[in-house]
UniProtKB/Swiss-Prot annotation:
Record lineage: Eukaryota, Metazoa, Chordata, Craniata, Vertebrata
GO biological process: Arp2/3 complex-mediated actin nucleation; endosomal transport; protein transport; retrograde transport, endosome to Golgi
Domain notes: The VCA (verprolin, cofilin, acidic) domain promotes actin polymerization by the Arp2/3 complex in vitro.
Protein localization: Early endosome membrane; Recycling endosome membrane
PANTHER family per the UniProt record, alphabetical: CXYORF1 (PTHR23331), WAS PROTEIN FAMILY HOMOLOG 2-RELATED (PTHR23331:SF5)
Region named Disordered: 289-365, 377-412, 426-472
Protein name per UniProt: WASH complex subunit 1
PROSITE patterns cross-referenced by the UniProt entry: WH2
Location of region: VCA: 352-472
Family designation: Belongs to the WASH1 family.
InterPro entries, per the entry: WASH1, WASH1_WAHD, WH2_dom
GO molecular function annotations of the record: actin binding; alpha-tubulin binding
Keyword annotations: Actin-binding, Endosome, Membrane, Protein transport, Transport
Residue ranges of domain WH2 in the record: 364-386
């Protein structure tokens, strides 16, 4: 009988012709095997041809798409118009891919379905033991060793079962005996031995390994610097290309390119992704006009206080009580528009450091600006601090008191003190010689006049003449 040894991965199987058959029986098996071989070979080649035809059809469809795309490209080569090509973000493939199927998928072995029966007329030959023994020298023989395995299994429980999942299921409880290999009668709880501490029994302890050199020799390992693997893109140097704006009549170049779409931010982080926002524009015309009207109306700055009435020109003091010379009086810190508005109201005597021809202005703003230019402006004016003036007055009063007390018996000193007090009374700086108390209106006027800076002498020549008049 033929042996059908087919595997699961094989789609076809062929029977083998056994030796030592009768002639008629051998002929029948040979014919049946050859017929089955022809059937299998025909099926194999038909399946291969079918797969080749399928692949050929797919290749023809791909070639058709390629030829169509090539024809479109050839047509677009001569056009001088700009063409936008929209590419899909997804790969042009079906959602569900077709799984690969084997060429021999679904093949059936017809030999297993066939059950051919032939009636043999010839009889079996008698068995020849000597011929069988001679054939054992040339043919492999399967020896049955099952009996020996059964005899060796009598010592234990036998082969290991398939449902063992752990070592504890293999060994005897609380022991190291494998009962499947050697079966022994042993009480697992009787032979329990407690192990004592090996240090108490004098056993040698296992020594630890030596410490590393970094601990024994106090050496410090050098810290290795970690390498930086971060991706830092660099734009590099972009070459400057000087080309004309338009190149007409070039083959393969469109002449109606219009780049009006926003390209979006760049991919390089070093390049500025977003343009710098522009600041909002402020309307300054209304603000300037309002400020001008306020300055003209006198609402931008408080109006300056009215100047006091001009006192009579004081005589030049003696060298002993002479105050520090001041070339120019400090002008009032008022902007030009405000001063123009208040020039009509103020007194001409308020311009102390200006020349004489500017005191009586003829035409408003022009004469005022001219007087400021002639006086040298604010930068050339020698301004003095109010605190320094007060300290100087205080020192002068102390010196006068010391001189008055120290030279009381001298006739010339008494005359000098009286003359100085008289001059102060005339100039408004202090009480006159005939006034005994300062509680009257003259004392209040003197205190007010002390807060006002003194007027400088208008001219050196006039000062000399006044001094001569006083001495005479």
């Amino acid at each position: 009988m033929p042996q059908n040894r087919s595997m699961e991965s094989q789609a076809y199987s062929l029977p083998l012709i056994l030796p030592d058959l009768r002639r008629e029986e051998a002929i029948h098996q040979i014919t049946d095997t050859l017929q089955h071989l022809q059937t299998v070979s025909n099926d194999i080649f038909s399946r291969i041809l079918q797969r080749v035809e399928t692949n050929r059809g797919q290749l023809q469809r791909i070639n058709g798409r390629l030829s169509l795309a090539q024809a479109k490209i050839e047509r677009l080569k001569g056009i001088k118009k700009a063409i936008k090509v929209f590419s899909s973000a997804k790969y042009p493939a079906p959602e569900h891919l077709q799984e690969y199927s084997s060429v021999f998928a679904g093949a059936e072995d017809g030999w297993l379905a066939k059950k051919l029966r032939h009636k043999i007329q010839s009889k079996h030959r008698p068995l020849d033991e000597q011929a069988v023994q001679e054939k054992l020298k040339y043919f492999p023989v399967c020896v049955n060793t099952r009996g020996q395995d059964e005899e060796s299994a009598e010592e234990g429980l036998g082969s290991l079962p398939r449902n063992i999942s752990s070592v504890s299921s293999l060994l005897l409880f609380n022991t190291t005996e494998n009962l499947y290999k050697k079966y022994v009668f042993l009480d697992p709880l009787a032979g329990v031995v407690t192990r004592t501490n090996p240090a108490l029994e004098g056993e040698d302890e296992e020594k630890l390994f030596d410490a590393p050199l970094s601990i024994t020799k106090r050496e410090q390992l050098e810290r290795q610097t970690a390498e930086n693997y971060f991706y830092v893109p660099d734009l590099g140097q972009v070459p400057e290309i000087d080309v004309p704006y338009s190149l007409p009549d070039l083959p393969g170049v469109a002449d109606d390119l219009m780049y009006s779409a926003d390209l979006g931010p760049g991919i390089a982080p070093s390049a500025p992704g977003v343009p710098i926002p522009e600041l909002p524009t402020f309307i300054t015309e209304d603000i300037t006009e309002n400020s001008r009207t306020d300055s003209q109306d006198g609402r931008l700055l408080p109006p300056p206080p009215p100047p006091p009435p001009p006192p009579p020109p004081p005589p030049p003091p003696e060298p002993s009580v002479l105050s520090p010379p001041t070339s120019l009086a400090p002008p009032l810190p008022i902007p030009a528009p405000a001063r123009v508005g208040s020039s009509d109201v103020g007194d001409p005597g308020s311009l102390q450091g200006a020349p004489k021809e500017v005191v009586n202005p003829s035409d408003g703003r022009a004469s005022l600006l001219e007087s400021i230019r002639q006086a040298g402006g604010i930068g050339k004016a020698k301004l003095r601090n109010v605190k320094e003036k007060k300290l100087e007055k205080k020192k002068m009063k102390e010196q006068e008191q010391v001189r008055a007390t120290g030279g009381g018996g001298d006739l010339m000193s008494d005359l000098f003190n009286k003359l100085a007090m008289r001059r102060k009374g005339i100039s408004g700086k202090g009480p006159a010689a005939g006034e005994a108390s300062g509680d009257g209106p003259t004392g209040a006027f003197a205190r007010i006049s002390d807060t006002i800076p003194p007027l400088p002498p208008p001219d050196q020549a006039s000062g000399d003449g006044d001094e001569e008049d006083w001495e005479s």
